[in-house]
Design a protein with these regions (language model features):
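Classical eukaryotic N-terminal signal peptides for Sec-dependent ER targeting/secretion
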Residues: 1-10
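N-terminal leader/targeting and pre-domain segments
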Residues: 4, 15-56, 80-163, 169, ...
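Long, highly charged low-complexity segments
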Residues: 10-11, 147, 175
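Aromatic-flanked redox-active Cys/Sec active sites in thiol-based oxidoreductases
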Residues: 58-64, 168-172
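Residue-level recognition of beta-strand->loop/alpha-helix junctions
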Residues: 60, 89-91, 196
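Typically the conserved alpha-helix immediately C-terminal to a functionally engaged Cys/Sec
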Residues: 65-82, 172-188
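Short beta-alpha junction loops
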Residues: 93, 172, 196-200
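Cationic, amphipathic, low-complexity alpha-helical segments enriched
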Residues: 194-195, 203-206
Length: 206
C-alpha cells in the first residue's frame, strides 16, 4: 500500500513539473490577469478596442529566462490598476502562431493595444510600474472638464437632474480613475475637475 501511495505521489509531482514547464506564467484563478489563447484573443483584446479599453500584453515563453523575474511587476500592475487597464499574458511556447501573427518573435515582448484607430505598439520602456503607467496614461481618453470662475455657475445650473462629481485637488494632472470614470459615465453623470493649487489635500465630493 505504501508503495502504491508513493507511486501516486511521484506521478503527481511529475505531472506538475510537466505542466509548469509548458504552463501559464500567470494564475488567473487568483487575479484578473487574463491568459490569452487563439480562442479568446479577439474577444478579450481585439473587440474591446472599440470600447475605449487599453490592453497591455506580456508575450512570453516559460523558458525565456526573464519573464519569471518580471512577472511580479505585471501582477502588481493588475492589483493596483485592475479595471482601468486590461492586463494579459500570452504563452508563445504554446501559441507560437498567434504570437507570430501579432508580430512577436522574441520573448519577452510587451505590447500595448490602445483604443482604435491607434495601432498596437511595442512597449520598450522599463518594466517598472511607474514607467508603464506613465506610458499607458497617454492613451486614456478624458472627458473631464476643468471648472473656473467663468463657468462654475453654468455647471451648477446646467441639467440639474444629472448627478455631478467634483474633484478638488492640488495636483496638475487628473487622476487616472477620474479619467476612466469620465468615459464610463459620459452620458449619465457629469465629471468636473476643479484644480486648487493652494490646497494640501485632495478631496473627492460626491
Amino acid at each position: 500500500m505504501r508503495q502504491i501511495y508513493s507511486f501516486i505521489i511521484l506521478i503527481i509531482l511529475i505531472s506538475n513539473a510537466l505542466l509548469s514547464d509548458n504552463g501559464e506564467l500567470y494564475d488567473s484563478r487568483h487575479s484578473t490577469l487574463i491568459n490569452l489563447n487563439p480562442m479568446n484573443f479577439n474577444t478579450q483584446i481585439t473587440n474591446n478596442r472599440n470600447k475605449e479599453i487599453i490592453s497591455f500584453i506580456h508575450f512570453y515563453s516559460p523558458d525565456d529566462g526573464k519573464s519569471n523575474q518580471l512577472k511580479d511587476v505585471f501582477i502588481e500592475l493588475d492589483n493596483e490598476y485592475s479595471g482601468m487597464f486590461k492586463l494579459a499574458g500570452l504563452n508563445c511556447k504554446k501559441y507560437k502562431d498567434l504570437c507570430a501573427k501579432e508580430g512577436v518573435t522574441e520573448y519577452p515582448t510587451y505590447k500595448i493595444y490602445p483604443p482604435l484607430p491607434a495601432p498596437p505598439m511595442k512597449y520598450e520602456g522599463k518594466i517598472e510600474t511607474k514607467y508603464i503607467i506613465s506610458y499607458l496614461r497617454k492613451f486614456v481618453g478624458n472627458k473631464v472638464q476643468e471648472l473656473n470662475n467663468n463657468n462654475f455657475d453654468e455647471f451648477i445650473h446646467d441639467k440639474p437632474e444629472i448627478p455631478k462629481i467634483l474633484l478638488f485637488t492640488n495636483k496638475k494632472s487628473i487622476p487616472l480613475i477620474f479619467m476612466r470614470l469620465s468615459l464610463e459615465f459620459d452620458v449619465s453623470i457629469y465629471l468636473f475637475n476643479i484644480i486648487l493649487f493652494h490646497r494640501k489635500k485632495s478631496i473627492l465630493v460626491l
